């Protein structure tokens, strides 16, 4: 576009200068043949004859109405043309330089580089060239994507944690219900087993005491065997001192039963006292059987009497294990009234 403008301006300038410098016809007279005729020896031939004009002048025939240019005028015309051409070229070059059309691509690139270096000294050449112009945009887009991904991950983690929490609550609820049911069933079964064991123990101990064919030592051994077996089944174990104390107490109860039974057999009259003694002997057998059973199944506090001289801490642990409040336990002969 700038080239077209510059060319138009140059053409206008050249045309104007040519018109001013060389406008109008030439007034100088020409020498040689004048007019429209060509003289020969015998004939006069008209100069306007086309064939003659062509033969003499060539293909370009000068205008017969204008004077032929002289040599001086031709030199001046050539000089003027060269001067005008020089002026026109110089002006056009200046104009093109002003608008930046006369420089090569490398020169223009150098000028742009120098301009950017002066205008933006804080930037490096790569940044001034614009090569990194898209990098901030790409980084920003990547940062936004990372933010979105992080947010999605956090949301997913929250949802997963919520689901896990709800699941754990449901599991805990089921476990609690199951545990309560199991505990209820276990306690019921334990109570049933406790009642059964107590009944069985009383029956066996009573049978042993009523078996008069057994000696005191045999009765004591059988009762102690029953007691220790039940204790081991319940997970309770006694020390040697505790076993000795239990054996002594059982032996004392057996002596009382034997004495009352013998006294009942010796007395022959069926007096009131005999009936009372007989009833006492019978009740004493049942009482002893129950007391021995309670020592294994549900003794609350009186088992301490069996453990006199033994470790008090062990006795407390044993009493706590059989704490159900159902029985007074085995009453000691040495218990203060």
Swiss-Prot record:
Keyword Ribonucleoprotein assigned: no
Record bears the keyword Transit peptide: no
Intracellular or extracellular location(s): Virion
Cross-referenced Gene3D superfamilies: 6.10.250.2700
A cellular component term, taken from the record's GO annotations: viral capsid
GO BP annotation list: symbiont entry into host cell
Keywords assigned: Capsid protein, Viral genome ejection through host cell envelope, Viral penetration into host cytoplasm, Virion, Virus entry into host cell
Assembly with partners or alone: The virion is composed of 60 copies each of the F, G, and J proteins, and 12 copies of the H protein. There are 12 spikes which are each composed of 5 G and one H proteins.
Function per UniProt: Minor spike component of the viral shell. Involved in the ejection of the phage DNA in the host and is injected with the DNA in the periplasmic space of the host. Involved in the determination of the phage host-range.
Name assigned to this protein: Minor spike protein
Source organism of this protein record: Escherichia phage G4 (Bacteriophage G4)
Lineage: Viruses, Monodnaviria, Sangervirae, Phixviricota, Malgrandaviricetes
């Amino acid at each position: 576009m700038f080239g077209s403008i510059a060319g138009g301006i140059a053409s206008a300038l050249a045309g104007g200068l040519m018109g001013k410098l060389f406008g109008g016809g030439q007034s100088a007279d020409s020498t040689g043949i004048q007019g429209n005729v060509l003289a020969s020896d015998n004939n006069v031939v008209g100069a306007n004859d086309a064939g003659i004009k062509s033969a003499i002048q060539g293909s370009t025939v000068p205008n017969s109405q204008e004077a032929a240019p002289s040599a001086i005028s031709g030199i001046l015309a050539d000089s003027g043309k060269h001067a005008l051409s020089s002026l026109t070229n110089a002006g056009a070059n200046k104009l093109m330089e002003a608008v930046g059309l006369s420089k090569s691509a490398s020169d223009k690139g150098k000028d742009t580089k120098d301009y950017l270096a002066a205008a933006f000294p804080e930037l490096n050449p790569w940044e001034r060239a614009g090569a990194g112009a898209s990098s901030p945009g790409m980084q920003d887009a990547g940062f936004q994507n990372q933010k979105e991904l992080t947010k999605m991950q956090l949301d997913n983690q929250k949802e997963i944690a919520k689901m896990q929490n709800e699941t754990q609550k449901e599991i805990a609820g089921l476990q609690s219900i199951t545990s309560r049911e199991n505990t209820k069933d276990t306690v019921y079964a334990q109570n049933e087993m406790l009642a059964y064991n107590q009944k069985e123990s009383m029956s066996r101990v009573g049978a042993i005491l009523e078996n008069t064919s057994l000696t005191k030592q045999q009765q004591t051994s059988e009762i102690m065997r029953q007691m220790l077996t039940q204790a081991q089944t319940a997970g309770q174990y006694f020390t040697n001192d505790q076993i000795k104390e239990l054996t002594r107490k059982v032996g004392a109860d057996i002596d009382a039963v034997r004495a009352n039974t013998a006294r009942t057999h010796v007395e022959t009259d069926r007096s009131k006292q005999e009936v009372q003694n007989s009833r006492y002997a019978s009740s004493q057998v049942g009482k002893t059987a129950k007391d021995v059973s309670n020592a294994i199944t549900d003794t609350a506090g009186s088992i301490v009497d069996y453990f006199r001289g033994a470790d008090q801490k062990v006795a407390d642990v044993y009493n706590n294990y059989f704490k159900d409040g159902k029985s007074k336990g085995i009453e000691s002969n040495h218990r203060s009234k």
